[in-house]
């Protein structure tokens, strides 16, 4: 977003960024939070962000990114829609090389800022594993509504709409906890439930939330080898493989290091 005025809100159990985080001249608003064992930090992410609600309301757009992502491509105004912005989960994607190779990028059926933009492919095994199936959970999605699946790592949109979404998801998560329920994929399950009822105006394709592996620059999704980034497109944001950066315990440890 090189043509936009951007401020960063960082939530961390470390007291400040001094000495270890390069801020690259951005305006930074730092909030120290308490360490919690996994999955509570991700489950409560919206509650955490809402600690800064009044300040966030001063901005036209709010976007949330996981801490373990790396921006590797230019992201521009295509993410700035008139409502919520959601990102296609790589496992719900379809992009066979035979479809894309040899085509002019402008002819690829993946226009920006259209709720129909990505090609979706949710196989039944993955659907049965990913969507919340507990009917008592506020994140439950019945089988007939399991048409799309969005990543939790990159989400946002117009400030008032996204704040309302965070408030409702936080309420639903607390309601679930009151019944001793944690959704299958934590806050991501609640995000997908919310988007069924409140469809996003802007859907970004899976290369805005691409899984890292040794050969990620090939554009092929490691665990879904038939899927690749179309010719003429580039990976925009890399979701880091925790095993390649110290291991899951360094991110999800139950004890403060």
What are these regions, as identified by a protein language model?
Residues 1-44, 51-58, 230, 249-257:
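N-terminal anchoring/stem segment of glycosyltransferases
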Residues 11-18, 71-73, 207-209:
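Short, polar loop motifs at secondary-structure junctions
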Residues 21-36, 46, 79-87, 107-109, ...:
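Active-site regions of enzymes building and remodeling cell-envelope glycoconjugates
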Residues 126-233:
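Catalytic core and acceptor-binding pocket of nucleotide-sugar-dependent glycosyltransferases
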Residues 218-257:
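C-terminal helix/juxtamembrane-tail motif
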């Amino acid at each position: 977003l090189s043509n936009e005025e951007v401020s960063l809100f960082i939530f961390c159990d470390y007291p400040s960024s001094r000495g270890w985080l390069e801020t690259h001249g951005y305006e930074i608003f730092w909030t120290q939070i308490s360490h919690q064992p996994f999955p509570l930090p991700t489950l409560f992410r919206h509650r955490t962000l809402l600690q800064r609600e009044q300040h966030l309301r001063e901005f036209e757009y709010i976007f949330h990114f996981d801490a373990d992502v790396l921006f590797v491509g230019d992201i521009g105004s295509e993410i700035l829609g008139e409502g919520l912005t959601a990102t296609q989960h790589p496992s719900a994607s379809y992009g066979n090389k035979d479809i894309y190779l040899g085509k002019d990028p402008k002819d690829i059926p993946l226009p920006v800022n259209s709720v129909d933009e990505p090609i979706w492919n949710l196989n039944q095994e993955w659907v049965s594993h990913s969507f919340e199936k507990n009917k008592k959970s506020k994140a439950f999605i019945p089988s007939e509504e399991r048409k799309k699946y969005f990543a939790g790592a990159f989400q946002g949109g117009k400030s008032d709409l996204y704040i309302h979404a965070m408030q409702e998801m936080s309420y639903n998560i607390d309601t679930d906890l009151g019944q001793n329920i944690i959704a299958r994929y934590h806050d991501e399950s609640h995000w997908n439930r919310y988007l069924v009822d409140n469809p996003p105006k802007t859907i970004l394709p899976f290369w805005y939330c691409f899984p890292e592996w040794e050969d990620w620059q090939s554009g092929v999704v490691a665990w879904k080898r038939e899927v690749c980034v179309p010719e003429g497109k580039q990976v925009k944001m890399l979701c880091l493989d925790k095993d390649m950066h110290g291991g899951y315990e360094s991110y999800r440890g139950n004890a403060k290091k």
